[in-house]
Every structure is written in structure tokens, then in C-alpha cells.
Amino acid sequence: MAEKFTQHTGLVVPLDAANVDTDAIIPKQFLQKVTRTGFGAHLFNDWRFLDEKGQQPNPEFVLNFPEYQGASILLARENFGCGSSREHAPWALTDYGFKVVIAPSFADIFYGNSFNNQLLPVKLSDEQVDELFTLVKANPGIKFEVDLEAQVVKAGDKTYSFKIDDFRRHCMLNGLDSIGLTLQHEDAIAEYENKQPAFMR
């Protein structure tokens, strides 16, 4: 079972960039592992650090600003997560501490992978995202409330509605990844297997 996601209130960091691809999110040299942990240290490695070893922080990159330390909601521009279809991208984001990414649009594969890893991708219109960038930049350290049950983002004195399809919303609310979904039908699977001829088992 994955962690349930119903509502999250967190610090917002504004990454004012469009077409952020998966190689920027987690560069290919860090993809040797197949477990989900440890990738957060290399999130946006080529942007966060001035050296290849990731030891010299780039003071001009927004994730390194003191006011955004501990951020758990990432605000971005259109086509977030484009490029190659590596599942390591949501792994890196969640391992760093992000729970939500808000953007006008996402690459399809990244969008699906995010739900599989309990990272909530929230689509809002370009105009709404513009408003949120203005709000965050004027109020560094502001927190948003993201309510998956009600499908709303509360930011400042405004509320923004978003839509998640019923199946994915059900899975997130109940902490169900693909394994969890399968285990819900464990008895039926066992019954089916027991009915198979011995030579097929």
C-alpha cells in the first residue's frame, strides 16, 4: 500500500520554466539504481549545483533560496516532465519532499507515472498559473492547501478547481498503487489460479 493522499498544505516554490524535461529533473548519470530512494539528492542536479559532484550549490537557482527550503509544492509552467519516459523523475521529486506539482500541462507519461508514485500533478489554466506565480513571488514562503477530495487549490484568498479522473483520484485517496490494486483482488486471483489444470500452475 502507498501513502494515502487526501489533503496537503505546503510551502510553494516557483520554478518559472516551461518544457522542463526528465533529464533536467534527474540527469541520466544518476539512474543506476532501481529502488525509489536516494534520487532527491540529485533532483535538478545540473541546475542546483555548479559542479558535477553536486557539492557546490548554485545560489541563483530557486530551490536553493533560503525562503523555499522545505518546499513540498512545486509550481511550474507548461509541458512539465517532457522528454524520455523515466519513472525516476517522480521518484526524485518525491524523495526530495514534493507532494504536488502544479502546472498548466504535463507530458503524458510523466503524468501517469506521478500517480503511480503518489505525486499529485495538478493542472490549472495558464492564466491561473500566472496568478499563482505572481502570488508566490510577492509572498515568498506562502503555503497552498491542495485538497484532492474537493479537487481544489486554496492559495491566498482564492480557490482554484482542478479535475482528476475518478480512477486515479480513488487510487490516490486510498493509497493504492498498481500492487495495491492487484492485492484488492487477491482472493479472486487465488480462486482463478486454483481452478487451472495442474500442468498450467
UniProtKB/Swiss-Prot annotation:
Pathway, per record: Amino-acid biosynthesis; L-leucine biosynthesis; L-leucine from 3-methyl-2-oxobutanoate: step 2/4
Catalytic activity: (2R,3S)-3-isopropylmalate = (2S)-2-isopropylmalate
Keyword Transmembrane helix tagged: no
Pfam family, one: Aconitase_C
GO terms under biological process: L-leucine biosynthetic process
Domain of life: Bacteria
GO molecular function: 3-isopropylmalate dehydratase activity
GO CC entries: 3-isopropylmalate dehydratase complex
Keyword field: Amino-acid biosynthesis, Branched-chain amino acid biosynthesis, Leucine biosynthesis, Lyase
EC number: 4.2.1.33
Chain's role: Catalyzes the isomerization between 2-isopropylmalate and 3-isopropylmalate, via the formation of 2-isopropylmaleate.
Family: Belongs to the LeuD family. LeuD type 1 subfamily.
Assembly description: Heterodimer of LeuC and LeuD.
Protein name: 3-isopropylmalate dehydratase small subunit
Upper taxonomic lineage: Bacteria, Pseudomonadati, Pseudomonadota, Gammaproteobacteria, Enterobacterales
